[in-house]
């Protein structure tokens, strides 16, 4: 489900109830951990206020508060190399109930109110800080290779020079095609990838309400290792197999890990 989080505090609890009902009737069960991937697109403007500094300060505060929520298994913010004002929030929860309880927490509501334009009143002149509404998609775990995404043993260095490479890929198989075959191909590719030098973690996810949509989370020691695998014959073979099954091209996003410091125009940097 596309869960738009453009809601005021008064709407949050009703939305959560409807969300749970929607998941209950969908084809992909919400049993087990829920992986929530949120796109965070901040306007790169400094006048009349610095949107990036306001938004990322709110984001880091939200992340730190969320890590103590019941059922939290992992909470990372990764910064897109191609456009540093774009990030992805990847949080993992023990269950759908835990995820919904997290959304109802005051720090979750306050974060969304802090960074999104709200319908007036109040405050009618407020216009900070993101370029498009926060949206997130929830996934179930299909298969994990090497270290789990939730492992604290994965690299924790931040910034361009210190971070491992965190790759998020979105895969949209044709709904009237053969998503099951596509899933099998993804899992086999994950297994092959896990044996490659520099590969630290590979996770295959399936979107809860749209079973033809998948995502992969990869962690690589270096971008050089990742690029070498992208040019490997096994990757080319995988692409040749899945291309006829796709409803849209694979969407690869290469990221670095965020810590506590963000620099306008540069992105996440060490403290």
Model-predicted regions and their roles:
Residues 1-5:
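N-terminal secretory signal peptides that target proteins for export/translocation
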Residues 9-20:
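Bacterial N-terminal signal peptides
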Residues 124-173:
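Surface-exposed beta-loop interaction hotspot
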């Amino acid at each position: 489900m596309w869960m738009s989080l453009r809601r005021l505090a008064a709407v949050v609890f009703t939305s959560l109830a409807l969300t749970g009902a929607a998941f209950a009737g969908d084809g992909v069960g919400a049993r087990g951990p829920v992986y929530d991937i949120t796109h965070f697109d901040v306007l790169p403007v400094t006048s009349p206020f610095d949107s990036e500094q306001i938004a990322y300060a709110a984001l880091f505060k939200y992340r730190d508060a969320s890590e103590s929520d019941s059922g939290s298994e992992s909470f990372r913010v990764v910064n897109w190399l191609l456009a540093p004002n774009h990030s992805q929030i990847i949080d993992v929860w023990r269950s759908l109930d835990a995820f919904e309880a997290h959304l109802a927490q005051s720090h979750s509501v306050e974060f969304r109110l802090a960074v999104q334009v709200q319908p007036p009143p109040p405050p009618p002149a407020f216009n900070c800080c993101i370029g498009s509404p926060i949206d997130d998609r929830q996934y179930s775990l299909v298969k994990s290779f090497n270290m789990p995404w939730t492992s604290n043993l994965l690299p924790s260095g931040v910034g361009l020079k210190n971070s491992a490479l965190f790759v998020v890929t979105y895969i949209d198989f044709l709904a009237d095609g053969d998503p099951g075959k596509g899933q099998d191909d993804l899992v086999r590719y994950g297994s092959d990838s896990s044996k490659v030098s520099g590969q630290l973690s590979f996770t295959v996810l399936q979107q809860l309400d749209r079973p033809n949509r998948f995502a992969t989370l990869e962690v690589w020691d270096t971008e050089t290792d990742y690029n070498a695998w992208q040019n490997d014959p096994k990757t080319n073979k995988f692409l040749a197999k899945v291309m006829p099954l796709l409803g849209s091209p694979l969407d690869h996003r290469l990221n670095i890990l965020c810590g506590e410091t963000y620099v306008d125009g540069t992105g996440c940097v060490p403290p």
